[in-house]
Amino acid sequence: QQQPFATIAQEGKAPYIASMALRKLYMDRAVDEEELRAFTEMMVALDDEFEFDSYEVHHQANDTIDAVGDNKKDAKPEQGSIQSNPNKGKEKDVNAGTSGTHTVPRIKAITPKMRMPKSKGATVLNLEHLLEYAPQQIDISNTRATQSQFDTWYEAVRMAYDIGETEMPTVMNGLMVWCIENGTSPNVNGVWVMMDGNEQVGYPLKPIVENAKPTLRQIMAHFSDVAEAYIEMRNKKEPYMPRYGLIRNLRDVGLARYAFDFYEVTSRTPVRAREAHIQMKAAALKSAQPRLFGLDGGISTQEENTERHTTEDVSPSMHTLLGVKNM
């Protein structure tokens, strides 16, 4: 009784859908080859011409047709009418940036008149590429290890710990939290610890530090955003300040999410947070005195002693003074 099916039924017609399609729709039952063959034979029997006749299909020629222009070309001017412009062709599209006959100019960000570096009279820049080139700051920053360096470090650590691909992400979780608390100094040694319930599980730091190229801090910079979110999550449950911020006496808990030494400062970092992070870094490096050279253990400072002493000498380091002896 629904429209338009009611009107179709009054005209002697009725919508048709095959029973095979209904079973597929409501019972999710696939149609087999026998049913398709029987359905095809039935349709051929209903229309004998369907199988024997041939049909020709003619496609429209690939000509560009202008509906407005063709109508004007075929139409004959009426008698007594004045033809204003008989040679007028296709009308120009209306520009949305125009007002009447005045065009609003568009200023380019980079123009060819700008002074540019040149070599042998030719510009060495591709301006079209430069207008579209806007990489992420962290992807080209030298404070972060490249993706290939991080992949090499990750695989080297996994091979050194002899653990599988499925277990490595859990180890990386523990390493990130440990570095938030203890920093990423290249002078760290011994073991780093992660918790398994109430049990401490130690891992050697040697493969972590030795395989970190250029530095461990640049490797851990890949964890910066996740570490920031982790600190924020901990602060939702209880007050949490990383050890890096506790040592620097950071009093504002709202800045705790920036209180770790491998935090990446970007253009989106608030000014107050950037100042606090730089002050903490300056305080951490103030007492550090890096030495280019250490004490060389292969150099001897002893010299050959050519002095000759006798029993008449005043002392082992002083000869006789004309018979005067030390009293």
UniProtKB/Swiss-Prot annotation:
The record marks 60-61 as: Cleavage. It holds the Pfam family Poty_coat. This is Genome polyprotein. Its EC number is 2.7.7.48. It is an enzyme of class 2 (transferase). Belongs to the potyviridae genome polyprotein family. Residues 65-102 are annotated as: Disordered. Coiled coil: none annotated. It catalyses: RNA(n) + a ribonucleoside 5'-triphosphate = RNA(n+1) + diphosphate. GO terms for cellular component: viral capsid. The keyword Transferase applies.
